[in-house]
């Protein structure tokens, strides 16, 4: 069977550690961790788990540096497939290793993508139209390891792995993002990010508090009619976004293709 390794970058995630390990110990063959200076027992708890086969520590906030270092250590485990997630993200509980084995055995697919749902408490996720539009996208990736893979070297918000070629398939596997359920945790994130982002973007940090959100009750059963209907709605939203992008790019291409040359360009052509 393919070797599946989960990579985790974390700082002071003790609030989520037990739940996270309960999820990924049943899915991953191995877990590789980068701890960015935890002081709350996170490092010790993760290091003690038998599935955690490597753990490295850094100081100072730099996501790009850390993810590339973590990727380097993960590659030493000779994985066939890799998944990067945060400590506050867990899959829906009904998913098993067999679900992932079925994905990994498809030789023509190199990437699988998963949706995240942003929880406002332990039982409800954010259901405003803005948040549903966000969840409609598949923003977590599991990939077949390749030497071309890398993470962009951004201090903040270094996104998913880059450089992995081949077919990507969106799945209906759901990730529960629990990072907003504790105000204390959101406060600490906001204080950290305030020192790292431009002034004009600082107001957007208030969105992390998920205030005035419409709560939607989470249902664990993947085959429940409400879950099937929700996935259908999100698929429609995503299809609309894709159609909008196609129209926009086609329009831009046609405008550039048939735009009349400027006077300067026309003079250059005539000369």
Predicted region positions:
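Active-site nucleotide-sugar/metal-binding loop of Leloir-type enzymes
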Residues: 68-81
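A short, glycine-/small-residue-rich helix N-cap motif at loop->alpha-helix starts
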Residues: 15, 59-67
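Short, conserved SAM-binding/catalytic segment
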Residues: 47-53
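A conserved acidic beta->alpha catalytic loop
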Residues: 35-45, 60-62
């Amino acid at each position: 069977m393919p070797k599946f390794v989960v990579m985790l970058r974390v700082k002071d995630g003790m609030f989520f550690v037990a739940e996270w390990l309960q999820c990924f110990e049943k899915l991953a063959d191995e877990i590789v961790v980068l701890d960015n200076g935890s002081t709350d027992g996170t490092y010790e708890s993760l290091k003690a788990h038998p599935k955690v086969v490597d753990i490295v520590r850094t100081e100072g906030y730099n996501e790009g540096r850390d993810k590339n270092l973590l990727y380097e250590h993960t590659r030493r485990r000779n994985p066939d497939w890799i998944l990067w997630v945060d400590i506050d993200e867990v899959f829906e509980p009904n998913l098993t290793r067999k679900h992932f084995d079925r994905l990994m055995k498809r030789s023509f697919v190199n990437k699988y993508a998963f949706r995240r749902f942003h929880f406002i408490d332990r039982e409800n996720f954010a259901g405003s139209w803005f948040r549903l539009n966000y969840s409609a996208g598949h923003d977590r990736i599991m990939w077949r390891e390749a030497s071309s893979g890398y993470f962009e070297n951004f201090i903040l918000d270094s996104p998913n792995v880059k450089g992995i070629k081949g077919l990507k398939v969106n799945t209906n596997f759901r990730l529960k993002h629990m990072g907003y359920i504790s105000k204390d945790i959101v406060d600490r994130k906001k204080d950290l990010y305030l020192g790292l982002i431009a002034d004009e973007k600082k107001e957007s940090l208030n969105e992390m508090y998920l205030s005035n959100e419409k709560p939607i009750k989470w249902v664990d059963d993947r085959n429940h009619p409400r879950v099937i209907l929700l996935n259908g709605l999100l698929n429609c939203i995503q299809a609309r976004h894709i159609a909008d992008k196609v129209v926009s790019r086609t329009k831009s291409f046609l405008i550039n293709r048939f735009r009349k040359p400027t006077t300067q360009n026309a003079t250059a052509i005539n000369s």
